Structure formats: C-alpha cells, structure tokens
Amino acid sequence: MNPVAFSIGSFEVRWYGIIIALGILIAMTLVSINAKKKNLNFDVILDLFLWCFPFAIIGARAYYVLFELENYHSFWDMINIRQGGLAIHGGIIGAFLTAFIYCKVKKVDFLAYADIVAPAFILAQGIGRWGNFFNQEAHGGQVTSEFISKFPEFIQRGMYINGAYYHPTFLYESIWDIFVAILLMIILYNITDRYKGVVISAYISLYSLGRFFIEGLRTDSLYFMNIRVAQLVSLLGIIIGIVAIIIIVSRGKKKRKGIFIN
C-alpha cells in the first residue's frame, strides 16, 4: 500500500495528513453545531484550537520520545516527526492542559467548552486512525488468513504486510471511537447544564476503556518496566473519568435538579 496520495515536485502529500486534516474539518464543524446548541461562543473554540493544536503535537512527540529515548541520539532526531513517532495520549494531555490554562487565563468556563468539544474530538480520533491504515502501522499481531477473510477485501490487502496478515487494530479503535462519539452526542444534547463536565468525563473513561483492551493486541506499544504505557494510562483514565462522573452527578442531585432535559 502506498502511503503517498500524490506529489508536488519533490514534496509528498501523504494520506495520513489528508485524513488528519479531514478529521479536524469534520470535528470543527461538529463543534460549531454543538456551540450553537449550547449557546457558547465558537470564536473561543477557534482560539483554543490555535493554542491546543501545536501543543498537542509537542505533547504527542514528547510522550513518545520519553519512552523511546535510547533510539534518539540528537535533538533533531527528537523533533523530526516526518519519520513518525506521535503518541495520542501525549497529544490528549498536551491539548487538555493547554485548554485548561487558556480557560483559566481568559476566565472561560472550561467544563462547558470541554463538553461540546469531547464528541468531536473522539470522532476526529476515529477518523484519524485510518491514517494508520494507509501507513500500515498501529496494527496488532499476526492472524490467520481465515480470520482476516471476514473483513472487506481492502482491509485484507492493507493488513497484508511482509508476507503475513495482522490484526486491524486501527479499525477496532476507529469503530469504538465513532460509537463513543455518538453516545457522547446523545448525552450532551439531553443532559442539563447543572451537570457540566459529565460529557468530557465520559469521554475520558470510555475512550480509555476501549484503548485499554485494544492496546493489548498491538505490537508497537511503548513500555515502562515491561508494562504497556498506554494500558497504564488508560487504566488511570477509566478511574479518573468514573470518579469525576460520580462527583458531578452527586453534586447535581444535591441541587434537586433532574439530570436530563425534559
């Protein structure tokens, strides 16, 4: 499979970049719809994007390099992302911290904006996973031809690498992410404003739940003391998300208000 969509002179335009751009475009469109529904200022979202996107890239790269330090021998190697090496957890952490700081400085309601962004963010993640497909990366271990035959033919071709078939873990995560995006949209449009933070908390816990199990199938995991880093971070995400939901809902009930819009 050719990861290059087309070339302009010596400059290669890769499918990965096209798909990421498409994911961002769709996500921003969805956020604009959510902002209008919740009477929030979309200009704030645009400002957040301009700040969060570069710091998400920095976070994704720093996270990856941190656990692969032995493979990098110069500062240029560390910052050269053209050769790959971005970790989604690092990107999420980078974007989350940047958004939190921005909202504090600008005195913007962080949870309100985080809730309308969460469904779009995980939808973009689900779309972005198809970039891994074109790069033939982020796959699982070897599988039999009988197993892979259950998938569409183009998936079979894409997962045939160096004479063997592999688990299309990118597909598993993409499906899970899109499912979670739909679920978060349902929650967002039906929950009262008294429960701000529930949607972003559900995102953290549900994304982490899917990633925890899918990570166990992958062959390119980052490790810390023989522990898959992504599974450890996902486990923490599940706990943090669930605890946050419990706290938010319990506080809301004390106000004697219903959880859902009538």
Swiss-Prot record:
Q: Which GO terms describe its biological process?
A: lipoprotein biosynthetic process
Highest taxon listed in the record's lineage: Bacteria
Supply the EC number(s): 2.5.1.145
* Main localization category: membrane
The cellular component terms of Gene Ontology attached to this UniProt record, alphabetical and capped at eight, are: plasma membrane
Q: Name one GO molecular function term.
A: phosphatidylglycerol-prolipoprotein diacylglyceryl transferase activity
| Residues annotated as binding a 1,2-diacyl-sn-glycero-3-phospho-(1'-sn-glycerol) | 129
This protein's record includes keyword Cell membrane: yes
Q: Which family does it belong to?
A: Belongs to the Lgt family.
* Summary of the function given for this chain in its UniProt record: Catalyzes the transfer of the diacylglyceryl group from phosphatidylglycerol to the sulfhydryl group of the N-terminal cysteine of a prolipoprotein, the first step in the formation of mature lipoproteins.
> What's the protein name?
Phosphatidylglycerol--prolipoprotein diacylglyceryl transferase 1
Source organism (scientific name): Clostridium perfringens (strain 13 / Type A)
